[in-house]
């Protein structure tokens, strides 16, 4: 994006979020900033010229030099000013609005101005937290409430809002039995004889019951009234929920189940005897025996198995070398020749035995663990056997002493030490008991078979055993023609072109032949494949054994040689009528019936049996899925049940159709789904009715309108999902929240237009005006003569006194006093500040003092003029006024939203403006042609035939013109004012100028800011400050008001500029003049004014 576009976008975003200076809560202040400008100055240079002289050698022409000046330009810094908008004190910025800030939250109202709350009806106090107490109501809480039994009194109407459980006009009556709650509208739900509290509806349960509705028994561990009594039962005993009597669990007895069953008994009520032996103890609850050490079993009847001892026989004996272990203690009883706690110590050293340990052991040392120290018997290592441990385990045995039998199967080898199996080819598994899975063979079944066409694979070597009809190593080759059977070793014996099956050698005869080898022709009267068809010829000499074509006798024709007789006739001379029914035809010879498809019987009077159809009822029906029975007896078509279609009645009716053959159209509306069987509708959430055309009743939603809406304040809810559609003035998920402050209406989408601190109704947006204001938006003050809330109170002020529109306070006219200004008063300035006479009237009463002051002022002006003339002469001597004449040049382009200076040029008047460094007086001089005019509130100076242009009318009543450099000369200044007041702010920021001619029009600069306003109903009138000596002294009022700006003519000692600023509607709080053409400041460079 181009930089200019980025800048424009940033500016527009700032403008969109900026404060509106028109907002009454927006204040502004000026701030300075420096900009680089180009300014002109007089640059000296040496100019050579020629003149006539007496130099005869140069033909009377001499060269001369002189210092001349030309206009040059240089860059300099200039201080400029811009206005920054910000929220006034007591307000904070929220988006592009200034919102009032209340230190204390308005509890029942809204903040309308700093620390000022507008309370809702019935509330008061600084933070709207104080309402009428419970005993009073009405205006000023002056009426006493009549409500009883803790009822609330409406602070506005005094109506009693009964507490739950009471009724009546004054809430003096309790709810009727069986009812409770607010307005006694709720029915009690208590069970088991419980009573209901009329206030809360709380059930007062009978002893032994609890729960919200007393529907539950007391929880375990409690009983009695309110289930407050703790059960004394111990060890899991349960008490009666009413009496508290204990029912003990098995194994416990006593009043509180604190005593276990006596020894030798157990179970419920300790009624069972213990069955334990050998001193075993019985568990008093379950009866399980806890055996003593050395015994085990359900009844402790078994001694610990060999090699174990101790409690539950859980410990392993540690006796070696054949030592026996005590089943109770685990102590070892050693064999002769061994000693020690575990019998692990030999009496003879290793390798010796016999008396005196003198005989060497005869065992094979590599395969022997040890030899017996007494007998010298060898103890072999696992996998070895024999007297001297020199023989490996025999086949089928392994381990210590070769005592363990091998478990390997199917010819597998067993490892003599570990007993692990090495399987033969074709088997797998830990003991080689699992044959190879189909398709695998070899050691560990690791190879994959390659047999095809159902051939079986040998699990040993993978060789293929082919099925009948196949041959080859992988059974992929079919038997050659003429052979069949296993390995294709059999020869076919089929004749007459019959095909031989390669699997079993059976012959598939061609039509007209039969027999095992197809060597026999079809018998007379038959034909076709396997001679299964019978010839149907009348008056024929048989039929073709292959095709079945009839060989008719002479005189007969037709497919069956029966076309002689007409239809329906048979017998001699076709004299007998056929009796066949249902479209059957009869034989012309004997009248036998040939039934039409779908019928059977001698006269074709019966339909096909269920499950068959067609000619001769020979064709089986297809499998009809959802039908009324088998297929149609003629066509074989399935007769579908309502809701199904398709050749097999296995298709559900398409959407929108139902009934028999799916011929009926569904009538379900609003996305309801239709049953394909009977057309009944299953409605979409939000709809009910036979055809789903009825919306859910108000207050219900969802499927079958089952759910109840939770919306409040008159909101409607969506019949589909229960979403609330709030009425105007409400928001939130269930429409329980009022619109936020300053918003109202549908979806809180309207902004309140109330002014002057008025409150806005959150539903209608109607303004409730503060005291002293009226109008639709409370934009109007009370009309003269009225005041107060709604401007309904009449002022009681007398003698032309002014009435305050808010409080009704009277401001008396001169000469009166009192609350209603009905008392006469002395005309003295010191007595009444509201009746102080104007400065003009004081001047008339003290004319002598005024004349004296004027004489002194004129003398002072003469002295000042002399000083300025002397200073100006010195400046001319230094050559400061040699810069060429400079015309006004706008520093930037004016836009339709800014003000412009029209016909801005230099005046031909001789009047000059200057500034005095000592007395800070702004003055303009010229020949005196009119009387002096004091620029104050009562004596405005008028502008003659001039106006200030503004291109558009939509502007605010405040505008500023800043004189930021020295005084300047402006003529032909024209201003067209809108209907509002127009303010011009003059600021002097330059160095002092020198007077040019006598006669001054001065402004005192002890306050450097002056505001001139104009009532725009009148245009400016003529008044030229060029002939008289008029001054503005603002020491008495630093913001003296000038009804019309005067015409000022000036001579500028240096480059100056004029700044005109239009109000900002929605601009940035910092409006920078040199930035964009839409800026609200215009800067004009002002050149040196000439006389």
Swiss-Prot record:
The chain crosses the membrane at residues 848-868. One of its GO terms (molecular function) is scavenger receptor activity. Its main location: membrane. The lineage of its organism: Eukaryota, Metazoa, Chordata, Craniata, Vertebrata. InterPro entries: EGF-like_CS, EGF-like_dom, EGF_PEAR1L-like, EMI_domain, LE_dom, MEGF10/SREC1/2-like. Homomer. Does not interact with MEGF10. Residues 23-100 form the EMI domain. Keywords: Cell membrane, Disulfide bond, EGF-like domain, Glycoprotein, Membrane, Repeat, Signal, Transmembrane, Transmembrane helix. GO terms for biological process: homotypic cell-cell adhesion; retina layer formation. Glycans are attached at residues 269, 530. Belongs to the MEGF family. This is Multiple epidermal growth factor-like domains protein 11. Residues 94-129, 142-172, 180-215, 223-258, 266-301, 314-344, 398-433, 441-476, 484-519, 570-605, 613-650, 658-693, 706-736, 749-779, 787-822 form the EGF-like domain. Residues 869-1091 are cytoplasmic. GO terms for cellular component: basolateral plasma membrane. It comes from the Eukaryota. Residues 1-18 form the signal peptide.
